[in-house]
Amino acid sequence: MSTPGKENFRLKSYKNKSLNPDEMRRRREEEGLQLRKQKREEQLFKRRNVATAEEETEEEVMSDGGFHEAQINNMEMAPGGVITSDMTEMIFSNSPEQQLSATQKFRKLLSKEPNPPIDEVINTPGVVARFVEFLKRKENCTLQFESAWVLTNIASGNSLQTRIVIQAGAVPIFIELLSSEFEDVQEQAVWALGNIAGDSTMCRDYVLDCNILPPLLQLFSKQNRLTMTRNAVWALSNLCRGKSPPPEFAKVSPCLNVLSWLLFVSDTDVLADACWALSYLSDGPNDKIQAVIDAGVCRRLVELLMHNDYKVVSPALRAVGNIVTGDDIQTQVILNCSALQSLLHLLSSPKESIKKEACWTISNITAGNRAQIQTVIDANMFPALISILQTAEFRTRKEAAWAITNATSGGSAEQIKYLVELGCIKPLCDLLTVMDAKIVQVALNGLENILRLGEQEAKRNGSGINPYCALIEEAYGLDKIEFLQSHENQEIYQKAFDLIEHYFGTEDEDSSIAPQVDLSQQQYIFQQCEAPMEGSQL
């Protein structure tokens, strides 16, 4: 019986007679995706607008009821908090000057590092609604801008704080402000909407339902300052982000044309967020992948794999990797852009996450047809993959194992022989000792494919001797396979039993020699093996 759920997900995606060929191309496990997102520092989902000291010095001093900067900073604080009764009175006054002055004070409070008093602001009765009301003051663009800044910083907080801004009705007004004649107001509205969309899939969908995309895309048609373009493409990437559930594709796909030319902007931040957006849009079924391909972005994405900033390389690689999870024709589009040489270069990256993603991408190429496997061979990638399989961090070795096993699954006899000649058997045998059941199965399947070829050769040449049995024994693979007959995973022990019975005969097993478990190294220890066996580093 197979184990239900995502534990089986990658193993089903394995081109083998006993497994489902329709699912051979692996999509990233949800759990792994979430971990990557949590660790990713290159892209922030929320940003707080904090004025620099220089900007604060250059601010105009308010007159007619306003306060000098020093007065604002030194204002007597309310007992137990930072919001004074004067600030509250001024915000609700009928004087535009006092309204602006008070709004600036709130903005300064919320721009303080590192812990702005967001809760105190939103818990002051009527204040958030008042700032939303100020957004409508078309006759006073400065008040609009300052109010938008306040609300942006509130929305940069946690989900509850963001929800307060939404419930006050700010989102439709912010979307209207994207068409403001004042660029400062436009940019602050973009920033606020990006923070709200970046909070959760629910907030993202609400912003999309409010029809943000047309006015947001319209911003890109203007000659904007760089900060505006940066904020707009970052907001756009937040609208495309999320998997549970993903955004409705029809609502975000109109941005593909804009993203295609943003890939040619020289600014690193713009490039990075455009690539992240494309990686989100391509992370899904083949029809989404096709839409991304049809936008004409593939060649440029491949070029960006060689960018000198990892902030760009990471999302470009993610997008390329997602595209090759498609069918063979879609994968070929990437191959036709000369991607393999760039991927080979990334296999030697000092950044482990890049190396791992490159292996994952290659594993989906080797899940293709034999011609595509041959292009990987011709690009001389397998020596690097086998080296990674022997020496890299475990999370990277796992992806390299998929790349090699996929090639043994769909490859020709000559292609499999080539992998054996490169020395793939020993590192595959070494993986049989790790505690990760899925990777043990991947290694077993790779070895089974090799043994099956050896059996065919033995029959063809009449020798009756499978040449690969000896190689597996020399790599202590037989000892490990024998032990796997007592594995707790039913599929593993059944596979191990079948391999022993079919390819190695039925030798008596000394059950008294049971290997110990080294939990610190996440592997089994075989006393009869003189050579050390590498364990995984989870």
Swiss-Prot record:
Residue span of motif Nuclear localization signal: 42-51
Location of the region described as Disordered in the Swiss-Prot/TrEMBL record: 1-41
Region annotation (NLS binding site (minor)) ranges: 318-406
Modification Phosphothreonine, positions: 3
Extent of the ARM repeats: 77-117, 118-161, 162-206, 207-245, 246-290, 291-330, 331-372, 373-412, 413-457, 460-504
Gene Ontology molecular function, alphabetical: nuclear import signal receptor activity; nuclear localization sequence binding
Positions of region (NLS binding site (major)): 149-241
Main location: cytoplasm
Keyword Nucleus: yes
Induction details: Injection of 6-hydroxydopamine into the ascending medial forebrain bundle causes the formation of lesions and leads to up-regulation of KPNA1 in the denervated striatum in a time-dependent manner, reaching a maximum two weeks post-lesion.
InterPro entries registered for this protein in UniProt: ARM-like (IPR011989), ARM-type_fold (IPR016024), Arm_3 (IPR032413), Armadillo (IPR000225), Importin-a_IBB (IPR002652), Importin-a_IBB_sf (IPR036975), Importin_alpha (IPR024931)
Sorted UniProt keywords: Acetylation, Cytoplasm, Nucleus, Phosphoprotein, Protein transport, Repeat, Transport, Ubl conjugation
Region (Binding to RAG1): 245-437
Compositionally biased intervals (Basic and acidic residues): 20-41
Post-translational modification: Polyubiquitinated in the presence of RAG1 (in vitro).
Residue span(s) of domain IBB: 1-57
A Pfam family matched in the record: Arm
Modified-residue entries (Phosphoserine), positions: 63
Location(s) in or outside the cell: Cytoplasm; Nucleus
One GO term of the biological process aspect: regulation of apoptotic process
Residues recorded with modification N-acetylmethionine: 1
Notes concerning its domains: Consists of an N-terminal hydrophilic region, a hydrophobic central region composed of 10 repeats, and a short hydrophilic C-terminus. The N-terminal hydrophilic region contains the importin beta binding domain (IBB domain), which is sufficient for binding importin beta and essential for nuclear protein import.
Family designation: Belongs to the importin alpha family.
Function: Functions in nuclear protein import as an adapter protein for nuclear receptor KPNB1. Binds specifically and directly to substrates containing either a simple or bipartite NLS motif. Docking of the importin/substrate complex to the nuclear pore complex (NPC) is mediated by KPNB1 through binding to nucleoporin FxFG repeats and the complex is subsequently translocated through the pore by an energy requiring, Ran-dependent mechanism.
Subunit architecture: Heterodimer; with KPNB1. Interacts with APEX1 (via its N-terminus). Interacts with CTNNBL1 (via its N-terminal). Interacts with AICDA (via its NLS). Interacts with ANP32E and ZIC3. Interacts with SNAI1 (via zinc fingers). Interacts with NSMF; the interaction occurs in a calcium-independent manner after synaptic NMDA receptor stimulation and is required for nuclear import of NSMF but is competed by CABP1. Interacts with DCAF8. Interacts with ITSN1 isoform 2. Interacts with TALDO1.
Protein name: Importin subunit alpha-5
Natural source organism: Rattus norvegicus (Rat)
